[in-house]
């Protein structure tokens, strides 16, 4: 079966692994998924990630992060721009997730970045997902 939205699958695997308190989650590799994982690590949503070669497309291993008393760091992840309905924003229309407490991942001409970085650089683009 062909996967129509690999990014949504990536986000769903992280969401599901987080809900059942897994330490790690493995997903098929791609450049966009690596960029999203890098942003999630920089913003403090995951502990770490690594790319593992498997002879095909590779695997991204994500180490999920939990706070004291096993409190979840990732409360929610939502896919915004989908293959059937792309969502684009101009530089002055970049959304704030939970009033600035969450993060929007935006695909710009300079690569994937957070909503804060896109606002700072004056770039618009495709809204990939929200993380809070």
UniProtKB/Swiss-Prot annotation:
InterPro entries referenced in this protein's UniProt entry, alphabetically: Ribosomal_uS8, Ribosomal_uS8_CS, Ribosomal_uS8_sf
Encoding gene per record: rpsH
GO cellular component: ribonucleoprotein complex; ribosome
NCBIfam families named among the record's database cross-references: PRK00136.1
Protein name: Small ribosomal subunit protein uS8
A UniProt-annotated Pfam family: Ribosomal_S8
Function summary: One of the primary rRNA binding proteins, it binds directly to 16S rRNA central domain where it helps coordinate assembly of the platform of the 30S subunit.
Keywords: Ribonucleoprotein, Ribosomal protein, RNA-binding, rRNA-binding
GO biological processes: translation
Subunit structure, interactors included: Part of the 30S ribosomal subunit. Contacts proteins S5 and S12.
Organism of this sequence: Syntrophomonas wolfei subsp. wolfei (strain DSM 2245B / Goettingen)
Superkingdom as given in the UniProt entry: Bacteria
Family: Belongs to the universal ribosomal protein uS8 family.
GO molecular function annotations of the record: rRNA binding; structural constituent of ribosome
């Amino acid at each position: 079966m062909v996967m129509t939205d690999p990014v949504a699958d990536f986000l769903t695997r992280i969401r599901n692994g987080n809900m059942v308190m897994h330490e790690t989650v493995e997903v098929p590799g791609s450049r966009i998924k690596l960029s999203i994982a890098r942003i999630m690590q920089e913003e403090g949503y995951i502990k770490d990630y690594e790319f593992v070669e498997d002879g095909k497309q590779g695997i991204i291993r994500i180490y999920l992060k939990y706070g004291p008393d096993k409190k979840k760091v990732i409360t929610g992840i939502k896919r915004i721009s989908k293959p059937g309905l792309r969502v684009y924003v101009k530089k002055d229309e970049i959304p704030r997730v939970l009033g600035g407490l969450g993060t929007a991942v935006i695909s710009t001409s300079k690569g994937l970045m957070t909503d804060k970085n896109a606002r700072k650089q004056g770039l618009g683009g495709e809204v990939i997902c929200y993380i809070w």
